[in-house]
């Protein structure tokens, strides 16, 4: 068992004030991507290469569940996010659409530890021959499923509401279309599933247990990552806006923000490669209640944002370069301890 003890000492303004944390590796995995608690002792997780597993966080036993997903592991794609809700499983994945083309698709099934027989409830169209920018995070609010569909590296497709890539999707839990989506409220040229456009590669999506808003994180290009709110019928501006970043060639993309587009709550330039997020609520770190926790891949850090006052957002680095690239984050529903998918492992964070 690998245990790292961390003393975060208040040296710089952006480093979290002195705390003793314990980071413990629970189990080793192979390219884990998404996770969801199914009860107080078990997580269901995905591995991008195609496996769905149950991990008992007490006994540390791992079991694999057979499934029928027609997925393709291609570049950044594979089996991605997973969400347990009311004894159903929702999964976002890279669907093989033939001729080298794939889509961000969502499937649903009744939960079983023996076999998961998924049925599709959404496909992002058109399918695209690309291994980039699938997005793929899932969140449920009331009886609606929200999902992020990345722009697949196609840039300005995110400004085309007749195509799904580069948008936030909102559908009913059975895959049908809500009658109050933007399409039916003045956005007659929008596809009926689309809730918001102008997004690049959103790998964080969460419902706040406090204000009941949906929040997201998004990858910029060379700089320009951000954290913001999902807003009905609005446009975050990609690829008209660059959010402070540039193309990988160094050529500017566009302004950081301008009127007419949704403004993010917080930006990162240079990029930290934001991934999964949560709005913390729990006992273990009760002083963090209501704060956003942002995982990062490139920067290998956990960031904490205090954003109650949008004119004075405060950021702390909780830890950095301790457990590898942080892909996903879950808060235990009872005790508030924090679990990460990072590198090729599941990790636990708790107070000493």
Which residue ranges define each predicted feature?
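Short linear, low-complexity motifs centered on an aromatic residue
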Residues: 1-2, 82
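Sec-dependent N-terminal signal peptides
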Residues: 3-13
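Acidic, Gly/Ser/Thr-rich repeat motifs that build Ca2+-stabilized beta-propeller blades
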Residues: 17-155, 204-219, 270-308, 332-351
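Residue-level detector of conserved, well-ordered beta-strand and adjacent loop positions
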Residues: 24-27, 66-67, 122-123, 184, ...
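Beta-propeller domain segments
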Residues: 77-79, 151-316, 324
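Short, solvent-exposed aromatic-acidic interface loops
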Residues: 95, 122-127, 185-187, 244, ...
């Amino acid at each position: 068992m690998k245990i790292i003890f961390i003393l975060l000492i208040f040296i710089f303004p952006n480093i979290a004030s002195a705390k003793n944390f314990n980071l413990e590796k629970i189990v080793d995995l192979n390219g884990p991507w998404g996770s969801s608690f199914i009860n107080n002792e078990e997580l269901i997780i995905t591995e991008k290469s195609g496996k769905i597993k149950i991990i008992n966080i007490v006994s540390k036993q791992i079991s694999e569940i057979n499934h029928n997903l027609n997925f393709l592991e291609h570049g950044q794609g594979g089996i991605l996010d997973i969400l347990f809700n009311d004894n159903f499983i929702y999964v976002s994945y890279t669907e093989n659409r033939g001729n080298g083309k794939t889509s961000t698709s969502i499937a649903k099934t009744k939960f079983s530890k023996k076999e998961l027989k998924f049925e599709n409830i959404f496909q992002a169209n058109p399918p695209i021959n690309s291994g980039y920018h699938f997005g793929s995070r899932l969140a449920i609010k009331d009886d609606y499923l929200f999902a992020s569909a990345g722009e697949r590296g196609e840039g300005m497709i995110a400004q085309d509401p007749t195509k799904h890539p580069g948008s936030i999707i909102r559908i009913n839990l059975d895959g049908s279309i809500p009658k109050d989506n933007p399409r039916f409220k003045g956005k007659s040229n929008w596809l009926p599933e689309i809730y918001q456009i102008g997004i690049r590669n959103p790998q964080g999506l969460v419902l706040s247990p406090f204000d009941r808003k949906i929040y997201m994180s998004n990858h910029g290009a060379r700089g320009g990552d951000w954290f913001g709110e999902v807003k009905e019928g609005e446009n975050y501006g990609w690829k008209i806006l660059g959010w402070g970043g540039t193309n990988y060639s160094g050529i500017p993309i566009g302004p950081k923000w301008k009127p007419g587009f949704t403004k993010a709550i917080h930006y990162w330039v240079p990029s930290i490669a934001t991934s999964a997020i949560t709005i913390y609520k729990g006992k273990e770190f009760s002083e963090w209640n209501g704060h956003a926790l942002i995982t990062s891949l490139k920067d290998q850090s956990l960031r904490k944002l205090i954003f109650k006052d949008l004119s004075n957002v405060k950021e702390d680095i909780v830890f950095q370069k301790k457990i590898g690239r942080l892909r996903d984050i879950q808060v235990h529903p009872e005790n508030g301890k924090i679990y990460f998918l990072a590198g090729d492992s599941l990790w636990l964070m708790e107070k000493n």
